[in-house]
A protein has these predicted regions:
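Solvent-exposed, extracytoplasmic
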Residues: 31, 35, 72-86, 159, ...
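Short N-terminal helix-loop-first-beta-strand/juxtamembrane motif that initiates sensory/input modules
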Residues: 49-59, 81-101, 128, 175-195, ...
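Extracellular/periplasmic juxtamembrane segments that couple receptor/chemosensory ectodomains to their
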Residues: 24, 210-260
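Membrane-interface helix-start motif
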Residues: 25-27, 171-175, 259-260
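Extracellular/periplasmic ligand-sensing ectodomains of membrane signal-transduction proteins
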Residues: 69-141, 193-212
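Juxtamembrane extracytoplasmic/periplasmic/luminal helical "stalk" adjacent to the first N-terminal
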Residues: 17-71, 84-88, 129, 142-143
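Extracytoplasmic/periplasmic ligand-binding sensor regions of membrane-associated signaling proteins
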Residues: 101-176, 223-238
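Bacterial N-terminal signal peptides
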Residues: 2-13
Length: 260
């Protein structure tokens, strides 16, 4: 986390310098690649560190005797504490192998089932889940899932998961990066579904839902690359962006800047 904080401090300093340049008569209107890269690294680091921290926390709970008991009443106090400690107001759940699950939001057994979630077979095969996008069955919020299996005697007996609100993650990034008005961040999964965005109304949309159809192929090409640059027009305004892929989440992170 120290590295991320350092990057944010550097980003703030560089962004302040960029703003000062913008007021000078000889200022350029193009994105500074160096400045944008620092901000991109800070943005990606903030999100990855937050989600990996959640994963670390639920793994610690998953190895407890309470979690291994597959008993909600025994496990509930630990999950309640975890839910209250999370900065992004998340729903913590405790799932059984048949997909039924308990939630801290519901304060017990829910009427929903997780077995139809695309990540659930992976979870039941003993693998962690990090970065899957869902509309939470517990809350209805646009969320990212972080989950881990609970193993006992070599078998998966339960799973602990957290559905984090993407709106609050975006606000968390906004608060900690303090970008200028003409610069913004966004990320998307492999299907070009927007996961976080400075403009919260654009989350859980595809680029073609925001602009014209020409954005589809442009972003599809970008999502095949590990990193790169992308220039496009949105609502008549020219946008320059740089991006890079997160191996941890299988998301692409973008920093974009609108030309004057």
């Amino acid at each position: 986390m120290c590295t991320v904080v350092t990057l944010i401090a550097l980003a703030s300093s560089l962004l302040a310098t960029t703003s000062a340049r913008a007021e000078a008569p000889a200022a350029t209107t193009k994105m500074s690649t160096v400045d944008a890269q620092v901000v991109l690294n800070a943005y990606q680091g903030l999100v990855e560190e937050h989600l990996s921290g959640v994963l670390h926390s639920i793994r610690a709970v998953a190895v407890s005797s309470e979690a291994k008991s597959a008993n909600w009443e025994r496990t509930k106090p630990m999950l309640d504490r975890l839910s209250k400690d999370l900065e992004t107001d998340a729903a913590v759940w405790y799932a059984m192998p048949d997909g039924t699950y308990f939630s801290t939001d519901a304060e017990g057994l829910t009427e929903k089932n997780l077995s139809d979630r695309s990540y659930f077979p992976r979870l039941m095969s003993g693998k962690d889940v990090e970065g899957d996008l869902v509309l939470s069955k517990s809350t209805g919020h646009r969320s990212v899932v972080v989950a881990t299996p609970v193993m006992a005697d070599g078998k998966v007996v339960a799973a602990i998961g957290v559905s984090l609100r993407l709106r609050l993650i975006s606000q968390f990034v906004e608060k900690n990066t303090q970008m200028p008005a003409n610069m913004y961040f966004y990320s998307m999964n492999a299907d070009a579904l927007i996961s976080t965005h400075r403009n919260i109304d654009r989350m859980f949309k595809h680029p073609t839902d925001i602009g014209d159809e020409s954005l589809g192929p442009a972003f599809a090409t970008s999502l095949k690359a590990e990193r790169g640059k992308l220039d496009y027009e949105l609502n008549g305004k020219k946008i320059s962006a740089i991006f890079q892929k997160s191996k941890a989440l299988d998301w692409h992170f973008f920093i974009a800047r609108q030309s004057d």
